[in-house]
Regions:
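Active-site alpha/beta core segments
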Residues: 33-131
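Short glycine-enriched, charge-decorated loop/helix-capping segments at active-site entrances
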Residues: 19-28, 121-125
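Short polar catalytic/cofactor-binding loops
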Residues: 11-16
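Catalytic P-loop NTPase motifs of RecA-like helicase/translocase cores
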Residues: 17-18, 114
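Extreme N-terminal starter segment of soluble prokaryotic enzymes
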Residues: 2-8
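Residue-level marker for buried hydrophobic side chains located in beta-strands
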Residues: 8-9, 47
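Active-site neighborhood of HAD-like aspartate-dependent phosphohydrolases
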Residues: 18-23, 33, 37
Protein backbone atom coordinates (compact mmCIF):
# COMPACT_ATOMS: atom_id res chain seq x y z
CA UNK A 1 0.00 0.00 0.00
CA UNK A 2 1.29 3.47 -0.84
CA UNK A 3 0.43 6.85 0.64
CA UNK A 4 1.28 9.43 -2.05
CA UNK A 5 -0.41 12.31 -0.20
CA UNK A 6 1.11 11.52 3.20
CA UNK A 7 4.48 12.14 4.79
CA UNK A 8 6.60 9.70 6.75
CA UNK A 9 8.21 11.58 9.64
CA UNK A 10 11.29 9.77 10.95
CA UNK A 11 12.36 11.01 14.38
CA UNK A 12 16.02 11.22 15.46
CA UNK A 13 17.51 8.01 14.02
CA UNK A 14 20.97 9.13 15.11
CA UNK A 15 24.07 7.39 16.38
CA UNK A 16 23.72 8.72 19.94
CA UNK A 17 20.28 7.08 20.23
CA UNK A 18 21.49 3.72 18.91
CA UNK A 19 23.52 1.03 20.74
CA UNK A 20 26.88 2.43 21.78
CA UNK A 21 25.61 6.02 21.72
CA UNK A 22 25.52 8.54 24.56
CA UNK A 23 21.75 8.15 25.07
CA UNK A 24 21.28 4.71 23.52
CA UNK A 25 17.92 3.01 23.14
CA UNK A 26 18.23 -0.77 23.34
CA UNK A 27 17.69 -2.16 19.84
CA UNK A 28 17.35 1.34 18.40
CA UNK A 29 19.24 0.33 15.29
CA UNK A 30 16.80 -2.50 14.55
CA UNK A 31 14.24 -0.04 13.21
CA UNK A 32 16.49 1.31 10.44
CA UNK A 33 15.74 -1.34 7.81
CA UNK A 34 11.93 -1.16 8.28
CA UNK A 35 12.11 2.65 8.07
CA UNK A 36 14.09 2.42 4.83
CA UNK A 37 11.49 -0.01 3.45
CA UNK A 38 8.64 2.37 4.34
CA UNK A 39 10.21 5.42 2.70
CA UNK A 40 9.20 4.37 -0.82
CA UNK A 41 5.56 4.08 0.27
CA UNK A 42 5.11 7.78 1.11
CA UNK A 43 4.82 10.91 -1.00
CA UNK A 44 7.28 12.74 1.24
CA UNK A 45 9.92 11.71 3.77
CA UNK A 46 10.98 14.01 6.60
CA UNK A 47 13.88 13.28 8.95
CA UNK A 48 14.36 15.06 12.25
CA UNK A 49 17.80 15.51 13.75
CA UNK A 50 18.58 16.40 17.36
CA UNK A 51 21.24 19.11 16.92
CA UNK A 52 22.52 20.59 20.17
CA UNK A 53 25.24 23.18 20.74
CA UNK A 54 27.85 22.06 23.29
CA UNK A 55 26.51 24.55 25.85
CA UNK A 56 22.93 23.28 25.62
CA UNK A 57 20.91 23.85 28.79
CA UNK A 58 19.53 20.29 28.81
CA UNK A 59 22.97 18.73 29.35
CA UNK A 60 23.57 17.71 32.96
CA UNK A 61 27.26 18.55 32.74
CA UNK A 62 26.35 22.18 31.99
CA UNK A 63 24.74 22.43 35.46
CA UNK A 64 27.31 22.25 38.27
CA UNK A 65 26.59 19.38 40.66
CA UNK A 66 23.70 17.99 38.59
CA UNK A 67 23.33 14.38 37.53
CA UNK A 68 21.82 13.06 34.30
CA UNK A 69 18.07 12.40 34.51
CA UNK A 70 17.55 14.90 37.34
CA UNK A 71 14.99 17.69 36.94
CA UNK A 72 15.60 21.42 36.91
CA UNK A 73 13.16 24.29 36.47
CA UNK A 74 13.57 26.28 33.28
CA UNK A 75 11.61 29.34 32.17
CA UNK A 76 9.31 27.04 30.16
CA UNK A 77 8.85 24.44 32.92
CA UNK A 78 10.56 21.34 34.28
CA UNK A 79 13.46 20.01 32.24
CA UNK A 80 15.11 16.60 32.45
CA UNK A 81 18.89 16.93 32.36
CA UNK A 82 20.38 14.55 29.83
CA UNK A 83 23.82 13.13 29.25
CA UNK A 84 25.62 15.13 26.55
CA UNK A 85 24.30 13.84 23.21
CA UNK A 86 23.82 14.80 19.56
CA UNK A 87 26.27 17.69 19.75
CA UNK A 88 26.36 19.61 16.47
CA UNK A 89 28.86 18.22 13.94
CA UNK A 90 29.72 15.20 16.11
CA UNK A 91 29.58 11.53 15.11
CA UNK A 92 26.82 11.05 17.69
CA UNK A 93 24.65 13.65 15.95
CA UNK A 94 25.05 11.91 12.57
CA UNK A 95 22.21 9.79 11.27
CA UNK A 96 22.64 6.04 11.63
CA UNK A 97 24.92 5.03 8.73
CA UNK A 98 22.36 2.61 7.28
CA UNK A 99 19.49 5.13 7.24
CA UNK A 100 18.62 6.07 3.66
CA UNK A 101 19.16 9.82 3.97
CA UNK A 102 18.97 10.21 0.20
CA UNK A 103 15.25 9.47 0.32
CA UNK A 104 14.58 12.47 2.57
CA UNK A 105 12.73 15.41 1.09
CA UNK A 106 13.38 17.51 4.19
CA UNK A 107 15.62 17.35 7.27
CA UNK A 108 14.48 19.32 10.32
CA UNK A 109 17.08 20.08 12.96
CA UNK A 110 15.80 20.62 16.48
CA UNK A 111 17.28 21.51 19.85
CA UNK A 112 19.74 23.97 18.34
CA UNK A 113 18.81 26.84 20.67
CA UNK A 114 21.08 26.59 23.74
CA UNK A 115 18.48 27.81 26.22
CA UNK A 116 15.53 25.60 25.29
CA UNK A 117 15.08 21.93 24.55
CA UNK A 118 12.91 20.54 21.80
CA UNK A 119 11.22 17.16 21.62
CA UNK A 120 8.99 18.10 18.69
CA UNK A 121 9.59 18.63 15.01
CA UNK A 122 7.01 21.43 15.13
CA UNK A 123 7.53 23.43 18.34
CA UNK A 124 10.18 24.07 20.96
CA UNK A 125 9.39 22.98 24.53
CA UNK A 126 8.01 26.41 25.38
CA UNK A 127 5.24 25.72 22.79
CA UNK A 128 5.66 29.26 21.49
CA UNK A 129 8.66 29.12 19.20
CA UNK A 130 7.94 27.31 15.95
CA UNK A 131 10.55 25.86 13.63
CA UNK A 132 12.71 28.62 12.24
CA UNK A 133 15.28 26.48 10.41
CA UNK A 134 14.50 23.52 8.21
Amino acid sequence: MTYPQAALIVIDVQNDFCPGGALAVTGGDEIVRPINDLMAEFGAVVLTQDWHPADHSSFADNHAGSEPYSLVDMAYGPQVLWPRHCVQNSAGADFHPDLNQGAADLIIRKGFRASIDSYSAFFENDSQIGRAHV
